Amino acid sequence: TGMLMLDRVLYTSTHYPANYGFIPRTYAEDGDPLDVLVLCSEAIYSLALVKCYPIGVISMLDNGAIDDKIIAIPFNDPTYNSYKDISELPRHIFDEMSHFFRVYKQLEGKETAIDEIKDSKAAVKIVEKCIDRYIDYFCKGKPQPEIKAHEEQPAEV
């Protein structure tokens, strides 16, 4: 429709550690477009398309389901474009991202955990797999799998 839909309001006082969005025309295992954190020296506006390359992936468990977060760098950002792999990031930047994803859903009563940190080659493979999945389900008409982990459950107070 060309309109934005608010996906979530964070329940915690934390904030996203980088520009957070999705990779268009991908379909991840959680039934959503593939998530991406774009490390950039500038804030990026909603609906902006940014040419990036992946440097790694934070593979998470979100209520028991896999939820990959691609970490990417804009080609034209001189502050960050010397980094080619997640292992090259300053430790503090990596620690901020890891901390955020461990706590950002706690007040919703949801459990998240970091399962694995993977390199740029693994990130490229995940992006390619999610592009292929998008083509299968949205271009070729393959039936979509039932995704149960994404259903909203009320939090207990």
Where are these regions (language model features)?
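Hydrophobic N-terminal alpha-helices or hydrophobic patches in metabolic proteins across all domains
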Residues: 1-157
